[in-house]
Amino acid sequence: MTSGEPKTSLKNACPSARRLLPKAEEEEEADYCAPGAFELERLFWKGSPQYTHVNEVWPKLYIGDEATALDRYGLQKAGFTHVLNAAHGRWNVDTGPEYYRDMAIEYHGVEADDLPTFDLSVFFYPAAAFIHAALGSDHNKILVHCVMGRSRSATLVLAYLMIHRNMTLVDAIQQVAKNRCVLPNRGFLKQLRELDKQLVQQRRQAQSSDDSEKASEKEL
């Protein structure tokens, strides 16, 4: 299932997260605040019931499960060039660069447990950088997977959309959930919420700085 870039909207979010959609594009996030865990889970519940082995959630970006990652022939036939394993390790999905050594596939492993107490946030930026680099070429196609393709892999894809596609957490959830049934655990949602706060604050500060520079230029 192919999906294009989403229209930024918070119409289905909680009132505290609803954007007022002002005229100036640079003011879009002025009234945004990160929803709580329950409100975020409701966004997932409103998403697509579709849950197959693998689904495209953003152009050339797919979330899948262990079966997809282990199917070397299927990956090659589908044209995947990159694999991000969010369940790397002996006791999870034990693949790695050697597993794909005779294939034109670049591998990145994240050794993570699907537990609310596990700190997945330390992998947000490295994983997002790997995904972003993979999508830098129109010829590339990346699979992000864990065991079920619902929690760890979805969390890293959401972080990527927030970091490199300038989406809020709500926007990112809506984009992914309309294409695949996913649901990160409560701990991961809390970590994504913290990332959301940081990114929104950074954008507000950058916008404030730009506004100050423009005001100074007008005075000259």
From Swiss-Prot:
SMART domains: DSPc
Coiled-coil stretches: none
Entry-linked Pfam families: DSPc (PF00782)
Binding locations of substrate: H145, C146, V147, M148, G149, R150, S151, R152
GO molecular function, one term: protein tyrosine phosphatase activity
InterPro entries, per the entry: Atypical_DUSP_subfamA, Dual-sp_phosphatase_cat-dom, Prot-tyrosine_phosphatase-like, Tyr_Pase_AS, Tyr_Pase_dom, TYR_PHOSPHATASE_DUAL_dom
Broad class of where this protein is predominantly found: cytoplasm
Enzyme class: hydrolase
Extent of Basic and acidic residues compositional bias: 211-220
Region annotation Disordered: where it falls in the sequence: 200-220
UniProt keywords, alphabetically: Cytoplasm, Hydrolase, Nucleus, Protein phosphatase
Active site: C146 (phosphocysteine intermediate)
EC number of this enzyme: 3.1.3.16, 3.1.3.48
Catalytic activity: O-phospho-L-tyrosyl-[protein] + H2O = L-tyrosyl-[protein] + phosphate; O-phospho-L-seryl-[protein] + H2O = L-seryl-[protein] + phosphate; O-phospho-L-threonyl-[protein] + H2O = L-threonyl-[protein] + phosphate
GO CC terms, sorted: cytoplasm; nucleus
Function comment: Dual specificity phosphatase able to dephosphorylate phosphotyrosine, phosphoserine and phosphothreonine residues within the same substrate, with a preference for phosphotyrosine as a substrate. Involved in the modulation of AMPK and MAPK1/2 signaling pathways.
Quaternary assembly: Homodimer. Interacts with PRKAA2.
Family: Belongs to the protein-tyrosine phosphatase family. Non-receptor class dual specificity subfamily.
Protein name: Dual specificity phosphatase 29
Lineage: Eukaryota, Metazoa, Chordata, Craniata, Vertebrata
The encoding gene: DUSP29
